[in-house]
Amino acid sequence: MLARGLPLRSALVKACPPLLNTGREGWGHHRVGTGEGAGISTRTPRPYSEIPSPGDNGWINLYHFWRKKSSQRIHFRHIENFQKYGPIYREKLGNLESVYIIHPEDVAHLFKFEGSYPQRYDIPPWLAYHQYYQKPIGVLFKKSGAWKKDRVVLNTEVMAPEAIKNFIPLLNPVSQDFVSLLRKRIQQQGSGKFAGDIKEDLFHFAFESITNVMFGERLGMLEDTVNTEAQKFIDAVYKMFHTSVPLLNLPPELYRLFRTKTWRDHVAAWDTIFNKAEKYTEIFYQDLRQKTEFRNYPGILYHLLKSEKMLLEDVKANITEMLAGGVDTTSMTLQWHLYEMARSLNVQEMLREEVLNARRQAEGDISKMLQMVPLLKASIKETLRLHPISVTLQRYPESDLVLQDYLIPAKTLVQVAIYAMGRDPAFFSNPDKFDPTRWLGKDKDLIHFRNLGFGWGVRQCVGRRIAELEMTLFLIHILENFKIEMQQIGDVNTIFNLILTPDKPIFLVFRPFNQDPPQA
């Protein structure tokens, strides 16, 4: 929208020492059956007030939260709290109170109560910026019928299988150009390999990809000279995420009132995002109006305008949100995926073998290849299990429900701790191991309501299909052309910057696998 972040069991224990005797079942909560209705009791539910909690004084809780410097390690804090309180707990920080759950069956039950218009938690500083500066909003912030109206239109243009097929010829050349970029770096280093941190290159790749899908035009982000205006947009998205965390726990009005530097930086980042997105949209909008025929798919913007199912202001708002959400999220997941493959060379070879076999069987047809790489697609799920973009998935249930024998009132903020779930041995065997095959087993109970990296249901990530296609194509071309290794042996942990990011640079080595790149 992020070890692996706790790379080894020893690192997990070091970061989160066991608070209860976990025995064989995980972190202090009992393992519950995974059949239909598991964990849902017919007994009279206990009241909400009895849900385990560190205390009801949100300001004292917030003081301890800050004292322990928990802001950037909130995902570890979730693990600690589940160790201490069991599979459900509530916590109040400042004015915000949430119920946290971890069990997949509880998640499945929660989603039955999300209603026709599911609501997620709105990031306070984001919402405050949009409201105070009267910025147009898209599906990220819209509610009820207004959200549904936009979402139905976007689903047709962004999520439908027919639409996804149109994106392949736009995204595939970007991945091929990234391979060319790495080959050029290998030549420049003159050692037969390239070693370094490619985080910025992945940002460029992700922005080049999402803008090509949106506008049907390339910006040239992978060329020798990077577009300076586009770089400003990328930098602004990065700053927007990183300035969000310090603004989460107090009312944004306070930061605005005192004009704190963090708030000013946050506003400046959003201003740049809106200004650049508006400029791009207007340029391509005017260009599209002058054309009557297109040799290739002209992009999502054109189809949204052509359908006339959205007002122009709504089109611009949703394009802005998809552009902002399509840079750090995708690039960070790809960085983690490369990291995992570099640490698990046997898995990397399995993935490469599948890709090469698919290339031969499909005779170079990339569309056919995409249907023949189930392990590679599973590896993306596995990366998101270990390194989810978001640490929680949130819902406000439409009516009262019972979870773990506790009554949860309607409109209570319930957060699914997906990072903690992904690290729990009660739900994933050998949870620290990068094992894509776990997603391909025949026992569906083993993956039931566990694949939540893109959210779930009608309010899942609107850019999910674009991101999945973009990452799959990228990994196909990388695996065909390079062997990936770690430059330095060592674990990389995670920090919470609204999305989960590495706590230090990831240095990788790319060695040519073939001298001649495969033909598309």
Swiss-Prot record:
EC top class named in words: oxidoreductase
Domain of life where this protein originates: Eukaryota
Location of this chain's protein in the cell: Mitochondrion inner membrane
GO molecular function terms listed in the Swiss-Prot or TrEMBL record: cholesterol monooxygenase (side-chain-cleaving) activity; heme binding; iron ion binding
Reaction catalysed by this enzyme: 6 reduced [adrenodoxin] + cholesterol + 3 O2 + 6 H(+) = 4-methylpentanal + pregnenolone + 6 oxidized [adrenodoxin] + 4 H2O; 2 reduced [adrenodoxin] + cholesterol + O2 + 2 H(+) = (22R)-hydroxycholesterol + 2 oxidized [adrenodoxin] + H2O; (22R)-hydroxycholesterol + 2 reduced [adrenodoxin] + O2 + 2 H(+) = (20R,22R)-20,22-dihydroxycholesterol + 2 oxidized [adrenodoxin] + H2O; (20R,22R)-20,22-dihydroxycholesterol + 2 reduced [adrenodoxin] + O2 + 2 H(+) = 4-methylpentanal + pregnenolone + 2 oxidized [adrenodoxin] + 2 H2O
InterPro entries cross-referenced by the UniProt entry: CYP11_CYP27_families, Cyt_P450, Cyt_P450_CS, Cyt_P450_E_grp-I, Cyt_P450_sf
Transit peptide: 1-39
GO biological process: C21-steroid hormone biosynthetic process; cellular response to peptide hormone stimulus; cholesterol metabolic process; cortisol metabolic process; glucocorticoid biosynthetic process
Region (Disordered): 27-48
Cofactor: heme
Pathway, per record: Lipid metabolism; C21-steroid hormone metabolism; Steroid metabolism; cholesterol metabolism
Keyword tags: Cholesterol metabolism, Heme, Iron, Lipid metabolism, Membrane, Metal-binding, Mitochondrion, Mitochondrion inner membrane, Monooxygenase, Oxidoreductase, Steroid metabolism, Steroidogenesis, Sterol metabolism, Transit peptide
Membrane-protein topology: Peripheral membrane protein
Record-linked Pfam families: p450
Cellular component terms (Gene Ontology): mitochondrial inner membrane
Binding site for heme: 461
Entry EC no(s): 1.14.15.6
Function of the molecule: A cytochrome P450 monooxygenase that catalyzes the side-chain hydroxylation and cleavage of cholesterol to pregnenolone, the precursor of most steroid hormones. Catalyzes three sequential oxidation reactions of cholesterol, namely the hydroxylation at C22 followed with the hydroxylation at C20 to yield 20R,22R-hydroxycholesterol that is further cleaved between C20 and C22 to yield the C21-steroid pregnenolone and 4-methylpentanal. Mechanistically, uses molecular oxygen inserting one oxygen atom into a substrate and reducing the second into a water molecule.
Assigned protein family: Belongs to the cytochrome P450 family.
Assembly mode: Interacts with FDX1/adrenodoxin.
This protein's name: Cholesterol side-chain cleavage enzyme, mitochondrial
Species of origin: Capra hircus
